[in-house]
């Protein structure tokens, strides 16, 4: 079995929405979009930056009305601020560990994500990009 962390952050507000799931496919992405949609403030709109993974671009996705998907060019993950979130989580909370079993992996993934979202200043620090705010 596998454990996948699906996560999105709002660097401006220091907020995050995430799920830990045993699969990485269209159904998982649909659950993630629903979670993000629920976390967007009333009257606000989120722009979700994505690579072009198959489960991101499938026409089967039903995107909530309060989310717009923005796709990066192929082979350019460095343009997505959330990649720095994954690197930070690996470097600080998830790498170089021995897990007892699958449940321990899921528990550590959930704990790492929850630790991140409990530190809004960390999300802001990792995710804000000067070029993203230029007019």
Swiss-Prot record:
Pfam families according to UniProt:
DDE_3 (PF13358)
Gene3D superfamilies the UniProt entry points to? Ribonuclease H-like superfamily/Ribonuclease H
Recite the UniProt keywords alphabetically: Plasmid, Transposable element
Molecular functions (GO terms): nucleic acid binding
Q: Which domain of life is it from?
A: Bacteria
Spell out the NCBIfam families in the cross-references. transpos_IS630 (NF033545)
What name is this protein filed under? Answer: Uncharacterized protein y4pE/y4sA
